[in-house]
């Protein structure tokens, strides 16, 4: 799951490394595995409505990279896992960043459930599911945050430790520390504002696709105009 607005080097590294870890599991058969890039409608809302052009740009870019894209209206991860469990009883893997995992352990997302957070986590982790966690760099301290040192709400700490110590959360240990400061929202802002430098934040070939298809509001004249002013 991601915003993919646009897809970045971080997104693809997270995917590639999580896939390697998933396939190394003896319970996983690679030929029977389906990889899906999911975008939730909850992350496509702009000023209270769906921005269709923005949504299509994200999906088109991922599809051009050969990926399968699924659009859902599941804001909570447990609903997503519950949906997939209708089609398979085999092991499932979720690749995500630290920030998203911390959100999973936020009680406010489960207030509408009669069983609260316990019901949600029962649905999420009852299935044969494993989370592959990509690290986060603290921009203030420079500290690399992993499953070992991330902080959840005190009331959720023991629940988190339970899933961590039972092997349901695995750290992605192979990563490029030089790209941890790349964020989709920053790249998107640079594209819209006609700034230079966003191309290096994206996987090889992605910048050319954005330029050729004028995705995410890319405007060649705006970019060229910015360069002339700088000169």
Located regions from the model:
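Nucleotidyltransferase catalytic core that binds NTPs
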Residues: 1-231
């Amino acid at each position: 799951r991601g915003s993919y607005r646009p897809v970045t080097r971080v997104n693809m590294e997270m995917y590639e490394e999580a896939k390697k870890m998933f396939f190394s599991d003896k319970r996983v058969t690679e030929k029977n595995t389906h990889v899906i890039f999911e975008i939730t409608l909850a992350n496509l809302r702009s000023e209270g409505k769906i921005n269709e052009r923005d949504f299509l740009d994200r999906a088109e870019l991922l599809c051009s990279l050969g990926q399968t894209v699924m659009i859902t209206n599941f804001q909570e991860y447990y609903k997503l896992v519950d949906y997939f469990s209708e089609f398979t009883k085999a092991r499932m893997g979720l690749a995500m960043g630290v920030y998203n995992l911390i959100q999973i352990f936020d009680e406010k997302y489960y207030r509408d459930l009669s069983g609260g957070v316990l019901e949600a986590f029962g649905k999420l982790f009852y299935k044969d599911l494993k989370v592959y966690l990509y690290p986060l760099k603290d921009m203030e301290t420079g500290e690399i945050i992993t499953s070992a040192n991330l902080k959840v709400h005190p009331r959720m700490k023991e629940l988190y430790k339970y899933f961590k110590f039972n092997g349901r959360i695995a750290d992605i240990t192979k990563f490029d520390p030089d790209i941890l400061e790349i964020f989709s929202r920053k790249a998107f802002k640079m594209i819209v504002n006609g700034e230079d430098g966003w191309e290096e934040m994206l996987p090889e070939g992605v910048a050319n696709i954005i330029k050729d298809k004028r995705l995410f509001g890319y405007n060649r004249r705006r970019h060229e105009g910015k360069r002339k002013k700088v000169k």
